[in-house]
Amino acid sequence: DGDYDKTRDKRETTAPAHVVDSRIQRLKAIDVTAKVRRGQNVVLQNTELLKGAELAGLIRYLQKREQLTDQADREMVLICWLMLLLGKTYEEIVDLSVFDELDGLTSGLYLDQKGEGWRCFPVSYSAKPHLDDTSKGLTPTQAFVFTPCPKFLLPMLRVGYAGGLKPLFLNKTITVEILQQRLKTYSDKSIEGGRITSDKLSNFMQRYCFASGCIDPVVLDFSYRLVLTQTRVSRSYACLNDDVRQDALLRLWNAVGLEIKAADPDVTLPAFFELRAWPHNQTVGSTFTPSLDTCKRLQSSLLSRLEEHKPARTYSYDSVIRYHNRYVLYTAYLLMFATGYRAVHNPLPSLSLHLKTYGLLAISDKDDADFTHARLVCVPPLLSQQLSYYEEHLTSLADFIRYRLPDLARTIDHLLRQDELMLMQHPTEAAAWYKKIKNSRTILGPLFLFHKQNDHWVPINIAPKDLIKDQPESLQLPANAGRHWLKSELIKRKVEPEWVDWQMGHWMTGQAPLAYYSALSHVEVSALLGVVIDEMLKEVGWKSLPSALT
């Protein structure tokens, strides 16, 4: 008995009873579900990334095979290059076309009359563009996007091409099995030690972007129609012109080239990407992004109408009310443009959510009962000053209306004392309180408008429809236009993708900036990001304005 070992020998056959055991079957089902969930989260699950030395060895191998006269060798070389440079699988590569006319566009390579090559792909839109977008003040977008093709690929792409619309690979002598076998043979003989696979080739660009943070992956999405997991949401908000998109691609491949050269200084690198302007305007992405001119017109309209409603020295009751409405709309629009706040009822439900000392704002605009997506975002100095002015405005407003609307005056006093009241509450009580006021249409928040009902002014929380109705007649912007503008401008100014996602609340599974194990310093990021957003706001014309009531 002393020699008895309870440890089961792994080589033993599983008891037949285990095969039909319901408990074990449930565990297996859970395991499968977990695998499916991981499979949907491509970037975090598949982390194998080609190193500089592996890429250098592969480039030498491809350059050597390209010199051979065998058609299969040249086809394999072209497939490998396209998988690496387009981020597409073998099946997607062999379905591409080559054409020299712009009629009936499709995915593939376009050869223009000058003999230059362009990679052409349709753009995937969450909401389709409309013909009247420009008249609404929105940035017009295109259905197809053209990206310069590296010149070193053109000789291989032109082999056997005589004009018209043709498949890129007519014979398809290289099947996916042959490609995998050749890559395996190369890897077995490689002195770098890493294994080159078709999966590593086709996913290199997106994994490199995610690992290095050199550019926002949405650039790849729009350029090559990749529809990546990590760009599913952000694709709806980013709007990129050709200069921004091509500059990002150039930075990406310059960074890759430096890593390859650091690993192998003697390797001869081709020009992975070359800047070349497409003859026509190419803006792709969000169909709800206001143009720079539109943003200036909106701000100018808000400012001029605020000036028009300044009360006279007598400060009549009606003039004070109307001025308050204009001041709230100006502040609300600035809040949306500066923070990326979603269009919701009762944004900024409490002034205590503005952490002035740290330059942060707590937002829970698209959340669940557990505040899974609650976030802290940067408050640029210009907005921080405006929120301080707004507090002073509410103090003066309460004094002006205390005789006529005593209940509302007391409510405003309560809103202004929320900081000290919060400190007296237990976290559980504070959470319950916040669930009641968040996006509330009945409990009054700091941003409210007076509406005329039966000859009486009634305060109602500001809503998305109020922002839309207040726009000049020449504009028809969505209520969350500021969110689209903010995302696009941050990418344009080459802000770290991680910071952009943090500000916008675009997180993937496993990312938790507010978790205990997070290494992200919100205060440091906010200090740096605030300077950038401040410049963006001032370029449009936004100012922090003290109230005429103070």
What is the meaning of each model-derived region?
Residues 1-7, 12-20, 70-99, 176-179, ...:
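Non-catalytic DNA-binding core/recognition domains of DNA-processing enzymes
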Residues 1-19, 23, 31, 52-63, ...:
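Conserved tyrosine-mediated DNA breakage-rejoining catalytic core shared by Y-recombinases
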Residues 31-90, 202, 292-343, 481-483:
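Basic, Lys/Arg- and aromatic-enriched nucleic-acid-binding interface segment
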Residues 64-68, 170-222, 226-231, 313-323, ...:
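Short, basic (Lys/Arg/His-rich) helix/loop patches that form interaction surfaces
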Residues 78-113, 216-221, 329-359, 495-502:
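Short, charged phosphate-coordinating catalytic segments
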Residues 131-194, 204, 283-303, 380-475:
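Active-site/catalytic core of tyrosine-dependent DNA strand-transfer enzymes
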Residues 253-308, 403:
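Long, charge-rich alpha-helical interaction segments
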